[in-house]
């Protein structure tokens, strides 16, 4: 059908506007609109493409949603080889590299460009007339695989450049540390093998055949190299980095133009010390001769360039004695082996326990109780047992085999699916499963029932007071007092008050608290916003669920299966009968001293957490923003403020200390 001219013009304007906001957010870190305003523009674009499918183009921002499933990945030849880098680990070796460079060039001085070495997956991006046409993995260096549809889902990679260039650039795709932790927690809950580190998680994600699934994992990127730089009048790596940023790519801001090898070493020392500050993994720095002409003169070997080297950080590993391997039962029945070892200090924290994930992990690494083992932090966050120090074995070490019965209740164990690695307790009445479910139900992000910690919940389960989560709402003074020692008047009153108050929690908290597999706080909010009440969610059909952004087939099936269980139906009825809120409350525009003001925070506050401060701001009629934009009215500064302070100062935004803010606007 003929598309009206004004619709075509609006469509092109929307595309350009959204890409401009993507550039400001991901490349410049300087957004000028709120998330809500961005979502409104994006939704309008989606609606236009639904109504007029002929409008849709390969560079449309809606390509980031995914939805394309491929049968496999085609092989693609690289224009020039994607070489790997030689590695060096100490100052002596980097000085040897420097001497080789000077000797080969017959020079006394060379300028270097130093970049952080992102621990991710290398990619080549090809653009034709400014539009992304192909994304290729490194592969064997000569031939890679076409992963274009998956790469299109990564928000920091532009689908259209700011100039109509035909160009190939190279860089790194990575998974942020927080996303790595989230995905591994989710996989462990599903009984799937966990990823060893963020790099493996990134590689696994990019090899998924369904781009919708890729879009759910928040990958990001940094570009750092231009193929055939002379075609764009670029003479140095520093010029290339600035050029990449100008045309729309996200570049890593932590780089240095080093005038001598001493400055290279200082840069390496600085980031070896500061790398824990970063939201992504780095495993060293990359040192490049800055001049492209000198790079050309130095050339390459068959495997690596002579003009660049990776100056690696040593991963901090500690050796300790694995005293015991305990078996832990989770809320879904998964039995997880947990290592308990002599306490060690690792990257600034004391650690003495680490998950061993599953029994396949134990077997593959031949980890035994009583071994001396090496520990490091996966993704710089989670303590992980790397493997045993076999030369220290005495023969008294004990092999831990999968249990034949539940270590807590003695019930049957097995696998729900033959494909999963997890072994589960299959007893629906297992007290340990119930205890973990209760702990989730009362937690801060769920029903937020304070005063019911793990110890008192265990006493209640052991005493038979709690058979399911709904039994919490049928506790009374007599039942709580029957627990005996340590339960005084104040404790009883506090527990009953907290339980009563929790009946009025928002619907999304209840959904999160129920323990639906694969449904966390973000998904729970999406479900609450869509269905408005629990009954509508319970009755929802598969097709309706998958229409909700962020709800894939796995989550939809998990929701349907969860609410089809007779046990769950009984629990929901008991919760209703007890007066627990089952519907989303109508949002009221709160009046207060902060009405109409957008408030942002940087640094740690002494009075409350970030989440509590956000809730406080909104309770006073204000809007809490995670980012400083030109629409921010006040930045509240706590201890150790970050870059938001500099940005707020450059925008002329009102800056207040925590004390000044609460003096003016009152405390909760």
UniProtKB/Swiss-Prot annotation:
Q: What is this protein called?
A: DNA ligase
Q: Does the keyword DNA repair apply?
A: yes
- Gene that produces this protein: ligA
Which EC number applies? Answer: 6.5.1.2
Task: Write one Pfam family the protein is assigned to.
Answer: Nlig-Ia
- What does UniProt list as catalytic? 117 (n6-amp-lysine intermediate)
* An annotated GO cellular component: cytosol
Under NCBIfam families, the record lists: dnlj, PRK07956.1
> Which residues take part in binding Zn(2+)?
406, 409, 425, 430
Task: Quote the PANTHER family the UniProt record gives.
Answer: CHROMOSOME TRANSMISSION FIDELITY FACTOR 18 (PTHR23389), DNA LIGASE (PTHR23389:SF9)
Q: Of which family is this protein a member?
A: Belongs to the NAD-dependent DNA ligase family. LigA subfamily.
Alphabetized PROSITE patterns for the sequence? BRCT (PS50172), DNA_LIGASE_N1 (PS01055)
The Swiss-Prot or TrEMBL record annotates one GO molecular function as: DNA ligase (NAD+) activity
What are the required cofactors? Mg(2+); Mn(2+)
Tell me which InterPro entries the record gives: BRCT_dom, BRCT_dom_sf, DisA/LigA_HHH, DNA_ligase, DNA_ligase_AS, DNAligase_adenylation, DNAligase_N, Hlx-hairpin-Hlx_DNA-bd_motif
Give the residue spans that cross the bilayer: none
Ranges for domain BRCT come to: 589-668
Cell inner membrane as a keyword of this entry, yes or no, is no
For this protein's source organism, the top of the classification is: Bacteria, Thermotogati, Thermotogota, Thermotogae, Petrotogales
Q: Which reaction does it catalyse?
A: NAD(+) + (deoxyribonucleotide)n-3'-hydroxyl + 5'-phospho-(deoxyribonucleotide)m = (deoxyribonucleotide)n+m + AMP + beta-nicotinamide D-nucleotide
């Amino acid at each position: 059908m003929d598309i009206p001219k004004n619709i075509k013009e609006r469509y092109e304007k929307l595309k350009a506007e959204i890409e401009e906001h993507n550039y400001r957010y991901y490349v410049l870190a300087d957004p000028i609109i709120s998330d809500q305003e961005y979502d409104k523009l994006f939704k309008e674009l989606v609606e236009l493409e639904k109504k007029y499918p002929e409008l849709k183009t390969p560079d449309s921002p809606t390509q980031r949603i995914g939805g394309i499933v491929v049968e496999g990945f085609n092989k693609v030849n690289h224009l020039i080889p994607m070489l790997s880098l030689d590695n060096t680990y100490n100052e002596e070796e980097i000085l040897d590299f420097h001497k080789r460079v000077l000797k080969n060039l017959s020079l006394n001085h060379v300028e270097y460009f130093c970049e952080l070495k992102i621990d991710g997956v290398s990619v080549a991006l090809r653009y034709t007339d400014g539009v992304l046409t192909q994304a290729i993995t490194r592969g064997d260096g000569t031939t890679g695989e076409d992963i274009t549809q998956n790469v299109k889902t990564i928000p920091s990679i532009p689908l259209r450049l700011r100039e109509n260039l035909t160009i190939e650039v190279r860089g790194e795709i990575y998974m942020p540390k927080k996303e790595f932790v989230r995905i591994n927690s989710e996989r462990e809950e599903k009984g799937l093998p966990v990823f060893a580190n963020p790099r493996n998680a990134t590689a696994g994600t990019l090899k998924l055949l369904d781009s919708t699934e890729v879009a759910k994992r928040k990958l990001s990127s940094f570009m750092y190299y231009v193929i055939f730089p002379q075609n764009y009048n670029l003479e140095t790596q520093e010029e290339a980095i600035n050029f990449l940023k100008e045309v729309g790519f996200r570049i890593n801001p932590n780089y240095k133009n080093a005038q001598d090898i001493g400055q290279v070493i200082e840069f390496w020392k600085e980031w070896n010390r500061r790398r824990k500050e970063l939201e992504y993994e780095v495993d060293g720095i990359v040192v490049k001769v800055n001049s492209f002409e000198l790079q050309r003169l130095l050339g390459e070997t068959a495997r690596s360039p002579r003009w660049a080297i990776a100056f690696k950080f040593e991963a901090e590993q500690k050796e300790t004695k694995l005293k015991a391997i305990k078996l832990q039962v989770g809320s879904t029945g998964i039995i997880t082996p947990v290592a308990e070892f002599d306490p060690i200090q690792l990257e600034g924290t004391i650690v003495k326990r680490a998950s061993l994930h599953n029994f396949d992990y134990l077997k593959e690494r031949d980890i035994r109780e009583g071994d001396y083992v090496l520990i490091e932090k996966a993704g710089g966050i989670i303590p992980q047992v790397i493997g045993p120090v076999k030369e220290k074995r005495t023969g008294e070490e004990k092999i831990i085999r999968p249990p034949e019965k539940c270590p807590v209740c003695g019930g049957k164990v097995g696998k729900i699916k033959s494909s999963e690695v997890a072994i589960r307790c299959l007893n629906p009445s297992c007290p340990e499963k119930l205890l973990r479910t209760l702990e989730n139900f009362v937690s801060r992000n769920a029903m937020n029932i304070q005063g019911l910690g793990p110890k008192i919940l265990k006493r209640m389960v052991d005493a038979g007071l709690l058979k399911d989560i709904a039994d919490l709402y049928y506790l009374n003074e007599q039942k709580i007092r029957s627990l005996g020692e340590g339960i005084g008047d104040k404790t009883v009153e506090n527990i009953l008050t907290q339980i009563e108050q929790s009946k009025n929690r928002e619907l999304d908290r209840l959904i999160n608290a129920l323990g639906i597999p694969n449904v966390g706080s973000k998904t729970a909010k999406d479900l609450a916003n869509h269905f408005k009440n629990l009954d509508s969610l319970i009755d929802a059909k598969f097709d309706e669920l998958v229409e909700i952004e962020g709800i894939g087939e796995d989550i939809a099936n998990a929701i349907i299966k969860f609410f089809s269980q007779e046990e769950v139906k009984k629990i929901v009825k008991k919760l209703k009968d007890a007066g627990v809120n089952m519907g989303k409350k109508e949002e009221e525009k709160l009046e207060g001293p902060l009405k109409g003001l957008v408030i942002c925070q940087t640094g740690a506050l002494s009075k409350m957490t970030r989440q509590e401060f956000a809730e406080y701001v909104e309770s006073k009629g204000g809007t809490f923003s995670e980012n400083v934009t030109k629409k921010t009215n006040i930045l509240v500064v706590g201890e150790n403020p970050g870059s938001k302070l500099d940005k707020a100062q450059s925008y002329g935004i009102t800056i207040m200390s925590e004390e000044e803010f609460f003096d003016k606007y009152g405390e909760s």
